[in-house]
Amino acid sequence: MVDDSSFFRRRVTDILNKDPNLEVIDVAINGIDAVEKAIALKPDVITMDIEMPLLNGIEAVKQIMAKAPTAIIMFSSLTHDGAKATLEALDAGALDFLPKKFNEIAKNTEDAGSLLRQRVIQLARKKSGRLARISTFRSRDSRELKSQTSTLTSKATSVTRSERSQTSIRKSSGKQYKLLAIGTSTGGPVALQKLLTQLPEDFPLPIIMVQHMPAAFTLAFAKRLNTLCKINIKQAESGDVLKPGCAYLAPGGKQMIIDGTENAAKLRILEDDSERIAFKPSVDISFGSAAKVFGGNVLGIILTGMGADGRDGSRLLKNKGATIWAQDEESCVVYGMPQAVTVAGISELSLAIESFPSAILKEIQHG
């Protein structure tokens, strides 16, 4: 537990210690202290503030991931600057984040505490070796990424024999894809970055993306992705016309719906103050609307994330004849959402995150 506020350290410690399966073994008051204790104590999970004296949270994450890879949850303010800093921390190797003000996590303190404990338990299941592999990805200079040759014949990443077999079966269907739809949650920012930065400028489909993320974060995240990727990426707005080579990120705190026809599809952003739907944005809602407009001409992908959001929406797509893929357990930060569609028999293919770009390009070329 890393924070320079003694009040916040006590509060988080009390919340975590309510679960008999969790124990706060020590606290750190700054980034330097955090790095030293991470190396010495080898905790399963670290909670980390961003703004601290001597060494800030972002630099502390970088050093910890280099010297003693550990699952790290960042606490962040829900501001534009807080969002940018949190995204930098995730890029440095942190796996998850939560608002520092508990009333911004949930409407009552007990629910907020329960969610924090759940997140810690989920991330504690990560092994340090897997964390080291996940943390090796770092964003490259945006100019380098933008200057890479745009081509649909990008070098193929190897896939297993069963994966190649399933892909060849789909090719004979002659499916004409009209949309790529992606849903994700915990671990999604880095996973999306790994996938989208490898897509060429002339990518032939529009892309919709649903990432569980607070309202204050999605605009900063979309802007960050846009600087790193060759395709155009923006936070979705009502009235946006879906265009090839453009990716639309659902805004936090709202729902993203597709209207119109597959050749004239537009986005509609809905305010959602109800308690009926837990996730805002919801993968199920966006995927369900994609099924109505695009039918089976969708390639749907469920990436790393906690829970089962996306399972019902993927089933609706699948029933229309769409193709559904999921991220494999090994490369997931949390194997929840991908597991849900896999166990339900909805997903046709499980891939490591690094394998998605080439597999997507092959699939949409051949149908």
Task: Enumerate the predicted regions with their spans.
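Conserved acid/base catalytic micro-environments in cytosolic active-site loops
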Residues: 1, 6-21, 27, 32-33, ...
